[in-house]
A protein has these predicted regions:
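Non-transmembrane, amphipathic alpha-helical segments
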Residues: 7-21, 46, 50-60, 82-85, ...
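His/Cys-centered metal/cofactor-coordination and adjacent catalytic loops
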Residues: 195-196
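Core structural elements
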Residues: 53-65, 202-207
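A glycine-rich, basic-preceded beta-loop-alpha segment at the flavin cofactor/substrate interface
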Residues: 1-15, 26-52, 228
Length: 251
């Protein structure tokens, strides 16, 4: 492994350690929430209703931490399968991880007793190495440097490991978003128009509305498995052209 890749791996491992410590706090808070809302061996909706804010904030913390964990895993996989010359994926993954930890910690710290935690426990979850990682990642200079690298790459974030099938889907709907959706987006939003036929008809012809329908029923999805990744790829490309005019259609 090249020296640069070793440095990236070390940074990803550090990010993973800080994230794991933060997730430990969330797990403890979830344990407390579960104990407070159980009725026998099942969660009571009535009791859970008394902990709406806690439930919401823990759900958000967990979702963000899970997303950060997957992004770190993706960056680690890229080091093995498609090393990125300037490490932009690693940088983005570590930055997102730090931002996730910062927002999660802020939620827990705002009302620690409601989560069954203390201020001391929250503070103890981040050691000196973790604090140093957070400070370096969240520094304005770091954000500016990452942004400059993304601009230099014209928005290309490197290999995505989608595979041939999903890459073809992405490229097809990316062209459609650029050539058809984007030129119409401003007028659709400004005039609060319904989605025009110029967008709907080609998408229908491309089979977009059958992406989640099994082939048995006339759709494009294989009968024996779902294609969630394909749905995400198409949604992201159409959303890039316009979230309101095309990105929400597939859902």
């Amino acid at each position: 492994m090249a020296e640069t890749s070793k440095d990236e791996l070390q940074l990803l491992e550090q990010a993973g350690a800080v994230l794991a410590a933060n997730r430990g706090l969330i797990d403890r808070a979830l344990t407390v929430l579960k104990a407070n809302t159980l009725d026998g061996d099942r969660v009571s909706p009535t009791k859970l209703d008394d902990y709406q804010l806690v439930s919401y904030e823990l759900s958000l913390c967990w979702a963000e931490c899970t997303a950060a964990s997957f992004l770190l895993c993706h960056a680690r996989r890229l080091l093995d399968e498609a090393p990125d010359a300037d490490g932009v994926t690693t940088s983005l993954a570590c930055l997102f991880c730090a931002e996730t930890i910062a927002s999660s910690t802020a939620r827990l710290r705002a009302r620690p007793a409601d989560f069954g935690l203390t201020e001391a426990e929250i503070s103890a979850a981040t050691d000196s190495a973790g604090a140093s990682f957070m400070a370096s990642q969240l520094a304005a200079d770091n954000l500016a440097a990452i942004g400059a690298r993304v601009l230099d790459r014209d928005g290309d974030l490197g290999a995505d490991l989608l595979g041939e099938h999903h890459t073809m889907m992405r490229d097809t709907f990316r062209r459609f978003a650029d050539d058809v959706v984007a030129p119409l987006a401003e007028e659709v939003h400004r005039e609060d128009l319904i989605i025009p036929a110029e967008i709907l008809e080609p998408l229908k012809e491309m089979g977009m509305f059958g992406l989640s329908i099994p082939e048995t029923y006339g759709g494009l999805q294989e009968d024996d498995k779902e294609d969630t990744k394909g749905m995400i790829v198409v949604t992201e490309e159409l959303s890039r052209g316009s979230l309101g005019a095309a990105g929400s259609l597939i859902t």
